[in-house]
């Protein structure tokens, strides 16, 4: 395919047009007086939103050079959303200002590389200042102020989230769920999170959010690498007899075993998700044991004397709901015995008191947080699909 080339001032001008086109559409949503945008959909009703990254995703320009500029700013918004989860409009406005002033300096004869180095030094200074000004959240009132943003959020819906008992504000979370009613309801459940996601995108159940959600699954816990059909088949048969989906937490799943599980998802014969077990090295078996206590199952390992071919229902853990993204797994409503969970937490706290190495202390604190974490599940409803998405 032949390429169209543009140089110097003309190229910079067309790139800047794309940057401004996207940024001007996004920045109207900035701040407490930010306005909404209406986005046309090829199918279904239009979307009303004041979320910067949602608006940015929809923008494609006819001019290929201007579109390159728009895509550069879109990448800024999407990266900010992925790392922070908010602040996309602010990032877009800052990117527009940096492009505008940088191009102005170049037009006046400044060396582009010196301009870039100056921007990088300024970024370092700004980050240092922001870190000094940062305020740690201190309790439920701080959480309410954060949750009430944007201003369209109602005080009623914010207060519908129950306070997570015996849990610090930093370890609690409130994931929204779609409801069949028009109001908002909530309940509190135990939750555990770790930073491993699904190993195959074919296991996704919600392509729009790129996440896999399993309701009331059984959970296979093992520190082994599963490759053959014979190794995974007993767990599949147990799950199918119980008519429940299967979550596999293992060192790895590959080969025919993975193909069998992926095929079951694609043909809707057996819903399953495979996640690499949390932890690394000698810590992996310890973290799997934490999960086995929380979920009420057993770890399939050489040390426990249980083989994959011997798996039965009593060896599998159970949970209310599992949400798996590309990089994170959230387990809500584990069904383990509370007495055993409390005993495990006391055991970990005793280890924490004896630990002297910072890395060991950090790992133990994380394991305790997973065992004691709670989540408030908010079910959000609306009269129309547009109202539901806005809430």
Curated annotation (Swiss-Prot):
Recorded GO MF terms: ATP binding; ATP-dependent protein folding chaperone
The entry's keywords: Chaperone
InterPro entries hit by this protein: Cpn60/GroEL (IPR001844), Cpn60/GroEL/TCP-1 (IPR002423), GroEL-like_apical_dom_sf (IPR027409), GROEL-like_equatorial_sf (IPR027413), TCP-1-like_intermed_sf (IPR027410)
Membrane-crossing segments per the record: none
Superkingdom field: Bacteria
GO biological process: protein refolding
Biased amino acid composition, Polar residues: 154-174
Stretches for region Disordered: 153-191
Pfam families attached to this UniProt entry: Cpn60_TCP1 (PF00118)
Family named by the database record: Belongs to the chaperonin (HSP60) family.
Main function: Probably plays an essential role in the productive folding of PrmA and PrmC, and thus in the formation of the active PrmABCD complex.
Protein's UniProt name: Probable chaperonin-like protein PrmG
Gene: prmG
């Amino acid at each position: 395919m032949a390429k169209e080339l543009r140089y110097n001032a003309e190229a910079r001008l067309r790139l800047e047009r794309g940057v401004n086109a996207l940024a001007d559409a996004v920045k109207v949503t900035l701040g407490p007086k930010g306005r909404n945008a209406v986005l046309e959909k090829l199918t279904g009703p239009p979307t009303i939103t004041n979320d910067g990254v949602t608006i940015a995703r929809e923008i494609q320009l006819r001019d290929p050079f201007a579109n390159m500029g728009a895509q550069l700013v879109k990448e800024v918004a999407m990266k900010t959303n992925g790392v922070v989860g908010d602040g996309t409009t602010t990032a877009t406005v800052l990117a527009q200002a940096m492009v505008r002033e940088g191009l102005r300096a170049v037009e006046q004869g400044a060396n582009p590389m010196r301009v870039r180095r100056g921007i990088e030094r300024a970024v370092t200074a700004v980050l240092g200042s922001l870190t000094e000004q940062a305020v740690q959240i201190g309790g439920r009132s701080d959480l309410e102020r954060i949750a009430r943003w944007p201003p369209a959020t109602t005080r009623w819906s914010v207060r519908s989230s129950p306070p997570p008992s015996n849990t610090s504000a930093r370890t609690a979370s409130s994931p929204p769920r779609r409801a069949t009613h028009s109001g908002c309801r909530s309940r509190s459940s135990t939750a555990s999170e770790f930073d491993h996601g699904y190993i195959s995108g074919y296991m996704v159940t919600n392509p729009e959010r790129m996440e896999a959600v399993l309701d009331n699954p059984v959970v296979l816990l093992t520190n082994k690498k599963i490759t053959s059909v014979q190794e995974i088949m007993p767990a599949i048969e147990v799950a199918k007899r119980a008519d429940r989906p299967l979550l596999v937490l293992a060192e790895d799943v590959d080969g025919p075993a993975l193909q069998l599980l992926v095929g079951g998802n694609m043909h809707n014969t057996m819903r399953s998700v495979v996640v690499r077990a949390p932890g690394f090295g000698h810590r992996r078996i310890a973290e799997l044991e934490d999960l086995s206590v929380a979920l009420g199952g057993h770890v399939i390992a050489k040390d426990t004397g249980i083989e994959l071919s011997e798996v039965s229902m009593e060896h599998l853990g159970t949970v209310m709901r599992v949400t798996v993204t590309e990089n994170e797994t959230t387990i809500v409503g584990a069904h383990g015995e509370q007495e055993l969970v409390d005993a495990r937490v006391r055991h970990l706290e005793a280890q924490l008191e004896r630990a002297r190495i910072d890395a060991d202390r950090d790992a133990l604190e994380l394991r305790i947080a997973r065992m004691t974490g709670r989540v408030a599940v908010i079910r959000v409803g609306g009269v129309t699909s547009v109202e539901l998405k806005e809430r």
